[in-house]
């Protein structure tokens, strides 16, 4: 039966170009495997004092609460339920909001939307409705009893002990995506939790007896042993975080702890891979977002910015338009990042070099930092079905840059990101198969042929070698830019050799191949010692701090 179905599927794909289950195209994990842990732990210590209110969060909630009610049929996936959430949170238009909720009916079914599940994606709606139930369900002044009953009995459509990982109506052939599993099964689990906590003793809704607790625990644990499949995804990272925030706030102690650890893992990666909320990592899904170059488009940044405003509204946070919807969710939920996930976004200590593995068929994240800068590698696509979007290698400073074009960056070969292997980052050095791009507001203090030196803020020097098919960027702190350029050019006088090998100021020899196949790290060796270039085998979190 499954074979017949699969063959029919292929025929449909070939003849009609229909929207097929996402896993066929590589959007979902098809195999489970634990990555080596590496030598970096996930920090979870929390000693910081957080404010209960934030002027920024209040303004976000107020803006959403002031919006007219959106059409349920057309905008019920995300916009309409968020307006309801904001109104209840702001305690605004309560009678009208309750009346609106009571008039609603489910607008679809859960799971990925495709040919045999055309009404899918209702789990996006469920996630926000679940937030509403738990935040306001016991406050009859805000959520009337009849409204709560309608929410539980009509609108929250998933309950019981079924834990569905596969795309609906795919005969179990295709795994659904992480965000769909978390939204659907998290909402199912939490409806059970609500019913059990409010007097329903049926084993069907007991998450321990029906197996949901264990299945969800195992799934969440997998996200911190295998890593996220949809890492840094635009737009799906936002919905993954929203589902995790529900579980962290409203689950059992076990599930709350599991969800918090996943969030802490994600935020630790964000902290080490960003500088003052500038974050531009490689991502899996979606290709349509590959053209985005502004840092405000990062959905994770929307959450992080909102959380940090609860720490201190005077932090040096960038003034920019953020992904509005996710600032609302972050404003309403109690989770706050661990201490180190806050600290290391702004303070890089004496610097570090870190590598985050994402498993077979993926691309890693690679970052090297000094006290006041961060070099961010861009990764490599691993074939069309990998759904991986590589990014330029970027140098981040504490200068308030708002887009890639305001940073020193490099990529190559060509402008076709599918051809890039931008993994060439190592200990303050970056190389790529294309020229280095310098914003006009940076002017060199010295030029020697294809070499140039830039004296940047915070006593940072950037040395650049750039030609049509090769670029090199070296970053140092507290050196004389002109003298440093003279020293480095003297050590690397052979420009042909420079395209495969670099000698550092302390005589270390770094070899690289900027045309490496995408399954390999561009950096080959250090002082003749071969490095592990097979990125499929890299640990989850590995690195060295100075």
Residue ranges and their predicted role:
Residues 21-183, 208-216, 309-546:
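Ser/Thr/Asn(+Pro)-rich, low-complexity disordered segments
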Residues 48-62, 70-78, 84, 201-202, ...:
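Catalytic cores of extracellular degradative/oxidative enzymes
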Residues 245, 257-322:
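Extended amphipathic alpha-helical segments with heptad-repeat/coiled-coil character used for oligomerization
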């Amino acid at each position: 039966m499954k074979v017949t179905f699969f063959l029919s599927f292929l025929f449909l794909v070939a003849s009609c170009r229909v929207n097929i289950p996402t896993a066929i195209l590589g959007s979902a994990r098809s195999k489970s495997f634990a990555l080596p842990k590496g030598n970096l732990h996930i920090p979870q210590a929390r000693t910081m004092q957080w404010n209960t209110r934030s002027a920024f969060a209040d303004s976000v909630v107020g803006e959403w609460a002031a919006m007219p009610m959106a059409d349920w049929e057309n905008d019920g996936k995300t916009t309409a339920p968020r307006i309801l959430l904001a109104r209840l949170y702001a305690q605004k238009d309560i009678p009208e909001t309750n009346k609106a909720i009571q008039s609603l009916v489910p607008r679809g079914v859960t799971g990925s939307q495709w040919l045999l599940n055309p009404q899918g994606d209702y789990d996006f709606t469920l996630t926000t409705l679940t937030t509403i139930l738990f935040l306001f369900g016991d406050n009859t002044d805000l959520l009337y009893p009849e409204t709560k009953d309608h929410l539980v009995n009509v609108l929250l459509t998933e309950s019981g002990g079924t834990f569905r990982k596969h795309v609906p109506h795919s005969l179990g052939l295709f795994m659904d995506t992480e965000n769909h599993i978390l939204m659907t099964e998290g909402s199912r689990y939490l409806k059970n939790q609500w019913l059990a906590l409010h007097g329903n003793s049926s084993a069907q809704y007991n998450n321990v007896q029906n197996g949901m607790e264990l299945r969800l625990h195992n799934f969440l644990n997998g996200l911190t042993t295998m890593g996220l499949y949809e890492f840094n995804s635009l737009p799906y990272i936002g919905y993954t975080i929203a589902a995790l925030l529900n579980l962290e706030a409203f689950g059992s102690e076990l599930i709350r702890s599991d969800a918090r650890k996943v969030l802490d893992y994600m935020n630790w990666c964000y902290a080490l891979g960003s500088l003052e909320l500038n974050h531009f990592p490689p991502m899996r899904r979606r290709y349509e977002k590959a053209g985005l170059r502004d840092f405000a488009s990062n959905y994770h940044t929307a959450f992080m910015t909102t959380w940090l405003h609860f720490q201190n509204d005077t932090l040096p946070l960038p003034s920019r338009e953020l992904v509005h919807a996710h600032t609302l969710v972050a404003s309403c939920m109690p989770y706050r990042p661990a201490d180190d996930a806050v600290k290391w976004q702004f303070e890089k200590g004496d610097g570090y070099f870190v590598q985050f593995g994402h498993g077979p068929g993926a691309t890693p994240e690679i970052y090297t930092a000094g006290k006041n800068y961060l070099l961010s590698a861009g990764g490599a696509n691993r074939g069309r079905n990998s759904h991986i979007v590589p990014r330029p290698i970027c140098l981040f400073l504490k200068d308030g840059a708002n887009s890639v074009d305001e940073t020193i960056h490099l990529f190559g070969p060509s402008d076709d990101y599918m051809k890039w292997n931008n993994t060439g980052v190592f200990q303050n050095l970056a190389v790529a198969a294309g020229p280095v791009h310098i914003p006009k507001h940076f002017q060199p203090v010295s030029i020697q042929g294809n070499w140039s030196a830039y004296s940047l803020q915070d006593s940072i020097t950037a040395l650049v070698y750039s030609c049509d098919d090769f670029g090199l960027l070296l970053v140092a702190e507290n050196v004389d830019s002109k003298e440093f350029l003279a020293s480095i050019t003297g050590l690397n006088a052979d420009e042909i050799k420079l395209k495969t090998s670099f000698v550092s100021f302390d005589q270390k020899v770094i070899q690289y191949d900027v045309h490496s196949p995408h399954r390999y790290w561009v950096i080959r060796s250090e002082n003749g010692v071969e490095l592990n270039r097979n990125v499929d085998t890299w640990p989850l979190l590995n690195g060295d701090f100075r």
